[in-house]
Curated annotation (Swiss-Prot):
This is Zinc finger MIZ domain-containing protein 2. Residues 334-354, 906-920 have a biased composition (Polar residues). Residues 60-79, 380-389, 876-890 have a biased composition (Low complexity). One of its GO terms (biological process) is positive regulation of transcription by RNA polymerase II. It comes from the Eukaryota. The modification Omega-N-methylarginine is found at R111. Residues 1-22, 54-79, 243-265, 286-391, 803-920 are annotated as: Disordered. Pfam families: zf-MIZ. Zn(2+) binds at C616, H618, C639, C642.
Length: 920
């Protein structure tokens, strides 16, 4: 018999090995003393035997898959009469708590004292695959329908790992009968026929009837067929499992009497449940060993229950090698599938109700068509590296966790920590590898770059910084990501999955910092066809989360209602409000009223935060968050209403429209009309035309950050209400002539750029369009923050952008003293630091001339030369690259940066992202 060891090489060491518990194959020692009748259940790992199904079936493998003759647990089976007694066999190593369908076949071997005493008798009640090991094909859910089934599944995982040694003598008689029963192992059926088939060869060969799952059944005796286990496993395996060897299934390889060495048995279960040693001393240690007394606990060979048992098996990685009482120790993986698979103490009641679900096949491992012939694991390609079984033990296995087939190291392209949507901006002089072409017809090329320790640490600590590697067509001036189909990339020997999407415009760049290391890094590019038409570039990029940008814009670009009104009136008076659907929209024709939709032109749902570009001449707004999300992947930054360029730093949040939206937020209105005096009224919805909006909103609205109602002061809402239907316009605006403290310190002042809002702008008469010309370009960035100090302070302490989002409540003016009035006496004051707000949040004030950068140094890099060592390219020509000089400039440092982070950190405009990179 070939021991399973030879297969060992097939299992690459798990990348996440447990250190001392390497996948060492632990040979099962066979004790000469073991009675021929005893059989052991062993789960073997990926060793693939040549044995065919018949072989497997023929071998009277113990439940563990070891030949019945050999005692997998030498110590246990060997001399221990206890095990020998049928009782022991009866106990299933693991109670399959599953659906209560443990392999409870009471009967045959159940040991009286053993709680749950169901014996192994129950084959894996899996139905055709007595073992419940679905053959490679997915096991029909019905397989597990039997009472034993559900539990079996769960238990199977567990049981597969436990070795049950017991005498089979008594069973022999039934064996032949039961084999036939395998297919339908009823709860009452005994495992014995299968697992116990002792009698050596006598084990009946499994009839085809065993069938796919039969295989599994067969496996029981001979060892679970690897794949059989797989399929189910596979899915369940999730990448975690996928990579792992499926330890449990003994591959039918070794003939019966031979002990199957446990390959891949990684750690003794004892680590986890030391006390529970199955088969301890030949008997289940009564104390802990008893796996859930749930109904029969099937012996170890778990049939491949779809994925569920996988975990056990893995977790079980028991070192069967331990002779003697140790038997297998199960490390229960915490709940498997999170479904009740908790091994209580020793109870492995895996209740996996879902087991019946279709089995999932493990990616990377072919399923072998013949039940008896396990297919050796294929070397997982870039997709799923072998993973250490431990992982399961560490975290509960969620019920239907699907493996991420992309790869362990798939690049987090569009999503950063917290899976937040992120915008991407190049950092000036942040190019690490200048755009390069591949050498003609060079299949594999290596490109080396250096990362200093300080740079590496900064990258890792800052979720908003990334190393972006992308490919683009040489004629594309926009450098939009486009990956030729034949390109494959790996970094430091870690294959990366390229997201190409459905069309060439949806390709995504790779983000490499998670696979980089301090010092030398190598990008290996493999192509199967010439890619001379494309260029590759590696650059540092700033990737702030949409939430942080949204917050920055709310603070810096919330255009006060009075200014919005003035702007609208000016546009009415000029007779040019392009892009609005109202009547008489032609230039030079006086407009009486304009219809404005309350729906975002991007999502066609009610706008939450109304915004426009600074240069837009229309009243119609779009939803700010939807617009930011729209520009996450390929930032075109064009207004969806008029198609003018609307860059991030030029966006304005319209407080007037926001007030209207809040005022009618609980109604179904879809449009309003606005007249030249800025009075507004809702347009009634025609009942037959109206389709109620879905309450949950569009998919884009995932990061709804703040409740817009909290952004407006009560006085603003009074003004909006006054402008609404039936109210005297502007009435509420008179009182503000007395400056009221406001946490929107100087709404106007924040826009007082040179010539932007003249000092003559009278706070008490917003209706007069005295706002001189709006400066053609976006106002300077150093706007004072326009939101309550509570929000500002909450951000000061946060270092990670995703966490900077203050709860919506923080924006609620009622939480901040001094927020009552919208107007401040400073509206007419000259721009600059001398703007004194009645209630300035001390820490948040800074002179207008200073760019605001967050405490995290959001995008602040001070000039650092040679931060990244000279990158060199090898393979496509070893031309060394000059050292990368990261200059102190960002794409629009004065304009962009202050929007992206909290404004608490005064920094020089010359500072930029690279300031975080140390020079040493």
């Amino acid at each position: 018999m070939n021991s399973m060891n030879p297969m060992k090489p097939a299992l690459p060491p798990a990348p996440h090995g447990d250190g001392s518990f390497a996948y060492e194959s632990v040979p099962w020692q066979q004790s000469a003393t073991q009675p021929a009748g005893s059989l052991s259940v062993v789960t073997t790992v990926w060793g693939v035997g040549n044995a065919t199904q018949s072989q497997v079936l023929g071998n009277p493998m113990g439940p563990a898959g070891s030949p019945s003759g050999s005692s997998m647990m030498p110590g246990v089976a060997g001399g221990s009469s206890a095990l020998t007694s049928p009782q022991c066999l009866g106990q299933q190593a693991f109670a399959e708590g599953g659906a209560n369908k443990g392999y409870v076949q009471q009967g045959v071997y159940s040991r009286g004292g053993y709680p749950g005493a169901p014996g192994f008798t129950t084959g894996y009640a899996g139905g055709p695959g007595g073992l419940g090991l679905p053959s490679h094909a997915a096991r029909p859910s019905t397989d597990f329908t039997q009472a034993a089934a559900a539990a079996a599944v769960a238990a199977a995982a567990a049981t597969a790992t436990a070795t049950a040694t017991a005498t089979v003598a008594a069973l022999q008689e039934k064996q032949s009968q039961e084999l036939s029963q395998y297919g339908a192992m009823g709860a009452g059926q005994s495992f014995n026929s299968q697992f116990l088939q002792h009698g050596g060869p006598r084990g009946p060969s499994v009839p085809a009837g065993m069938n796919p799952t039969g295989i599994g059944g067969v496996m029981g005796p001979s060892g679970l067929s690897p794949l059989a286990m797989n399929p189910t496993r596979a899915a369940g395996m999730t990448p975690l499992y996928a990579g792992q060897r499926l330890p449990q299934h003994g591959y039918p390889g070794p003939p019966q009497a031979q002990p199957l060495p446990r390959q891949g048995v990684k750690r003794t279960y004892s680590e986890v449940y030391p006390g529970q040693q199955y088969l301890q001393g030949g008997q289940y240690a009564p104390s802990t060993a008893q796996f859930a007394p749930s109904p029969g606990q099937p012996p170890a060979p778990s049939p491949s229950y779809p994925g569920h048992r996988l975990p056990l098996q893995q977790g079980m990685t028991q070192s069967l090698s331990v002779p003697g009482p140790t038997g297998l120790h199960y490390k229960p993986t915490e709940q498997f599938n999170g479904q009740g698979a908790s091994f209580n103490g020793g109870s492995v009641s895996y209740s996996q109700p879902g087991l019946s679900g279709p089995t999932r096949s493990i990616p990377g491992y072919p399923s072998s068509p013949l039940p008896g012939n396990p297919t050796p694991p294929m070397t997982p390609s870039s997709s799923v590296p072998y993973m250490s079984p431990n992982q399961e033990v560490k975290s509960p296995f969620l019920p239907d966790l699907k493996p991420n087939l992309n790869s362990l190291h798939s690049s987090p392209s569009g999503s950063g920590p917290c899976d937040e949507l992120r915008l991407t901006f190049p950092v000036r002089d942040g190019v690490v590898l200048e755009p390069f072409r591949l050498q003609h017809n060079l299949a594999v090329s290596n490109h080396v770059f250096q990362l200093r320790d300080s740079v590496y640490k900064t990258l890792i600590m800052r979720p908003d910084l990334e190393l972006q590697f992308k490919c683009y067509h040489h004629e594309d001036r926009q450098m939009n990501t486009n990956w030729p189909a034949s390109v494959q990339v790996s970094v430091n020997a870690t294959p990366l999955t390229i997201e190409r999407g459905d069309n060439k415009t949806s390709h995504k760049p790779l983000y490499l910092k998670h696979v980089c290391q301090p010092g030398r890094n190598t990008i290996q590019i493999t192509v199967t066809a010439c890619c001379c038409s494309h260029l590759f570039v590696l650059q540092l990029v700033h990737r702030p989360s949409v939430r942080s940008v949204l917050q920055g814009l709310l603070k810096k670009r919330l255009l006060p209602a009075e200014h919005c009104i003035t702007k609208i009136k000016r546009n009415f008076s000029s007779g040019t409000i392009p892009g609005t659907p109202g009547p008489n929209g032609e230039d030079g024709v006086e407009q009486t009223a304009i219809k404005v939709s309350l729906k975002c032109p991007i999502t066609f749902r009610r706008i939450q935060l109304p915004a426009r570009g600074h240069d837009c001449r229309h009243i119609q707004c779009f939803d700010l968050e939807s617009y930011l999300q729209l520009n996450c992947e390929r930032g075109t930054w064009r207004c969806p209403v008029c198609n003018k360029t609307a860059l991030l730093e030029g966006l304005e949040v319209d407080q007037y429209m926001l007030g209207i939206l809040i005022y009618i937020q609980n109604s179904d209105y879809e449009e309003i009309t606005i007249d030249p005096t800025c009075s507004w009224k809702p347009v009634p919805v025609k009942p037959d035309m109206h389709i109620k909006e879905e309450p949950d909103g569009p998919a884009l609205k995932r990061c709804r950050t703040v409740s817009p109602a909290h952004v407006l002061m009560p006085s603003v809402m009074e003004m909006i209400a006054a402008l609404g239907p039936g109210a005297a316009p502007f009435a509420p605006l008179q009182p503000p002539s007395v400056p009221a403290p406001s946490d929107y310190p100087g709404q106007g002042s924040s826009f007082l750029g040179p010539g932007t809002f003249p000092e003559s702008f009278p706070p008490t008469t917003p209706s007069t369009p005295t706002l001189a010309e709006f400066t053609p370009g976006p106002p300077p960035i150093s706007y004072q923050s326009d939101i309550p100090s509570s929000l500002l302070t909450s951000e000061k302490s946060t270092a990670c952008l995703p966490s900077q989002m203050a709860p919506a409540g923080h924006l609620d003016p009622t939480h901040n003293p001094g927020t009552p009035g919208l107007h401040t006496s400073n509206l007419g004051a000259p721009p600059g630091p001398q703007l004194h707000h009645s209630n300035p949040p001390p820490a948040s004030r800074q002179s207008l001339g200073q760019a605001s950068l967050g405490p995290t140094g959001e995008l602040a890099f001070s000039p650092a030369t040679g931060v990244m060592g000279p990158p060199s390219m090898s393979g496509a020509g070893e031309a060394p690259e000059p050292a990368l000089d990261l200059l102190p400039e960002l794409t629009n440092p004065d304009e962009l940066l202050s929007y992206l982070g909290p404004p608490d950190l005064p920094t020089n405009n010359n500072d930029d992202l690279l300031s975080l990179f140390e020079n040493n």
